[in-house]
Amino acid sequence: MKRDHQEISGSGSNPAESSSIKGKLWEEDPDAGGMDDELLAVLGYKVRSSDMADVAQKLEMLEKVMGTAQEDGISQLGDTVHFNPSDLSGWVQNLLIEFNGSTTTPDPNFNDDSEYDLRAIPGVAAYPPVKSDPGLEITRKRAKTESSSSSSSTTTRPVVLIDSQEAGVRLVHTLMACAEAVQQDNLKLADALVKHIGLLASSQTGAMRKVATYFAEALARRIYRIFPPDSLDPSYNDKLQIPFYETCPYLKFAHFTANQAILEAFSMASRVHVIDFGLKQGMQWPALMQALALRPGGPPAFRLTGIGPPQPDNTDALQQVGWKLAQLAERIGIEFEFRGFVANSLADLEPEMLDIRPPEIEVVAVNAVFELHPLLARPGGIEKVVSSIKAMKPKIVTVVEQEANHNGPVFLDRFTEALHYYSTLFDSLEGSGVAPASQDLAMSELYLGRQICNVVACEGMDRVERHEPLTQWRTRMETAGVSPVHLGSNAYKQASMLLALFASGDGYRVEENNGCLMLGWHTRPLIAHLGLATRWY
């Protein structure tokens, strides 16, 4: 095996600036107790913060009384429903009177003011309750609206009993409200909202809770400008990609469909050269090498150029991957040559560095799986790389990218799109059949969580997760003179068979879009594979 190693020095992104918030972001208003609660005001309600403890105390008393009433066989109010009351405190007091008799004395410390609408009190999910019995679960019960007659002549009024589904809706609305406050640079409101997001998320389970937690963390990092020290370390992401590869079919689909396109392009060639823009652990290439070894007429001479980022411990990870692939090539009888290039950015590469041979001697393929979108953070980066690709004169260029729009100019739009996109991804992870407590699943979620943090918390050159939809990539490439090619129905059929390995394929969908392949969860496309060819061919 021949192997060369080169390091390309280039200007990378500056490390994310970290700053800690000293003291408070704003001064507290000493008269704030009489003001409207700003968290609820932004959601459209008028509620005084000073009223909340009193209402919570009355709800606690009502829970105790209702429990006693059920034991005594008094059930006329057990199914009473009170829908959208304008005076929640007064209604609770009336119920206490009906249970305990007209001699019950209202709490002297509670001042009722019907001017304020207490409908929106989120309960224990959003506000820590006053000390109460563990049985206080009024926010967890199913909301229902039905009427029943009481022993008195007064008209029955409905009550809102909030369940976890309603809390989930409120969680999403609060996430959106916090993102809007961030966009408007309202740090006081954003700070209040992001704290309540964590409390609301605790009332959820499964994918919703995990997604909300990651988005809350990302919002908090953006608000307080606190970033993890390894937020821009690509080598760490490369390691996290391994369990993500094992847990769900997205990377396997990307590698499989790219290999199929490359294999078809190499069908008649005696010498082939693959330039991998992101070698990582080299997981994509053993399958292609084995397919080439079985080719009728014998395998071609296979040359692989792998590009990767510098390692924090200065180890030569590319060399280690190259040696493993060389051992495989020797076992299956393929002539193999490997070269590794260390680069901070693909924009630092020049075609002359890669020893490109004439097309009549060697057929070239360029492979870019989730590698092009970070170039959008660097002015002129994507244009430079596309120009280099054209100079390499490849027969096939395989591009796999996230089918999402996380690169718009408006923060709230990016946040909304990211919330929908990653909610679907986390949902698919839970449906992939992996044990919920497995380490691979936890690492896969961390892999996606780091992407969420970058999309939401970072800006400028530090924001590298700039995903764009297939239509934009196709237009960009066509404008640069790199034309899409049809991937073929064979790749579609085999990709569909691949999905059967993951929870029998339930939920995953492959679709063809103008010659491109997309993999999604139910009706939402999540990644797209675009095959390209230079006009030289």
From Swiss-Prot:
Q: Where is this region: PFYRE?
A: 364-454
- Please tell me where this protein is predominantly located: nucleus
Q: Which pairs of positions does the record mark as disulfide bonds?
A: none
Compositionally biased region (Low complexity): 9-20, 147-156
Q: Which UniProt keywords apply?
A: Gibberellin signaling pathway, Nucleus, Phosphoprotein, Repressor, Transcription, Transcription regulation, Ubl conjugation
Q: Where is this region: SAW?
A: 457-533
What does the PTM comment state? Phosphorylated.
User: Where is the segment annotated Leucine repeat I (LRI)?
Assistant: 169-223
Q: Which InterPro entries does this chain map to? A: DELLA_N_sf, TF_DELLA_N, TF_GRAS
**Where on this chain is DELLA motif (motif)?**
37-41
What Gene3D superfamilies does the database record attribute to this sequence? Transcriptional regulator DELLA, N-terminal domain
Q: Is Repressor there in the keyword field?
A: yes
Where in this protein would one find the motif LXXLL motif, according to its record? 372-376
Q: Where is this region: Leucine repeat II (LRII)?
A: 320-352
- Give start and end of each GRAS domain: 162-533
Concerning its family, UniProt says: Belongs to the GRAS family. DELLA subfamily.
User: What does it do?
Assistant: Probable transcriptional regulator that acts as a repressor of the gibberellin (GA) signaling pathway. Probably acts by participating in large multiprotein complexes that represses transcription of GA-inducible genes. Upon GA application, it is degraded by the proteasome, allowing the GA signaling pathway.
Name of this chain's protein: DELLA protein GAI
